[in-house]
Amino acid sequence: MSAHLQWMVVRNCSSFLIKRNKQTYSTEPNNLKARNSFRYNGLIHRKTVGVEPAADGKGVVVVMKRRSGQRKPATSYVRTTINKNARATLSSIRHMIRKNKYRPDLRMAAIRRASAILRSQKPVVVKRKRTRPTKSS
């Protein structure tokens, strides 16, 4: 079944849809922007890209759909864990998408998603407030 036909079926009646604040969001896997649109849908396309946080809380996991074996959902995804510094992680995601000519329209969305995940994994440094000495009169 073509992606366009699947989109016509799924676009208004999917278990992943969330409609609130006059906008429609989607919680499906491999939807990089969580937006209910044809381009970012993670279920209907033959090639999809997903970026998730790693299980141990350090790094990201890039999920890509295989071209072959589309009828076998258990083996249709390739998961690659990237546990490097931020610049190397974003660079390797960029190369995975660009060098393989794999959905170039999703490149920037995948990089931004990975950047947000890496930023959230950074430890937060608590700044101590400076207290002024009390005035004695």
Curated annotation (Swiss-Prot):
The lineage of its organism: Eukaryota, Metazoa, Chordata, Craniata, Vertebrata. The modification Phosphoserine is found at residue 115. There is a cross-link at residues 58, 65 (Glycyl lysine isopeptide (Lys-Gly) (interchain with G-Cter in SUMO2)). GO terms for cellular component: cell body; cytoplasm; cytoplasmic ribonucleoprotein granule; cytosol; cytosolic large ribosomal subunit; dendrite; postsynapse; presynapse. It comes from Mus musculus (Mouse). This is Large ribosomal subunit protein eL28. The keyword Phosphoprotein applies. Pfam families: Ribosomal_L28e. Component of the large ribosomal subunit. Keywords: Acetylation, Cytoplasm, Isopeptide bond, Phosphoprotein, Ribonucleoprotein, Ribosomal protein, Ubl conjugation. It comes from the Eukaryota. GO terms for molecular function: structural constituent of ribosome. GO terms for biological process: cytoplasmic translation; translation at postsynapse; translation at presynapse. Component of the large ribosomal subunit. The ribosome is a large ribonucleoprotein complex responsible for the synthesis of proteins in the cell. The keyword Ribonucleoprotein applies. Belongs to the eukaryotic ribosomal protein eL28 family. It is found in: Cytoplasm. The modification N-acetylserine is found at residue 2.
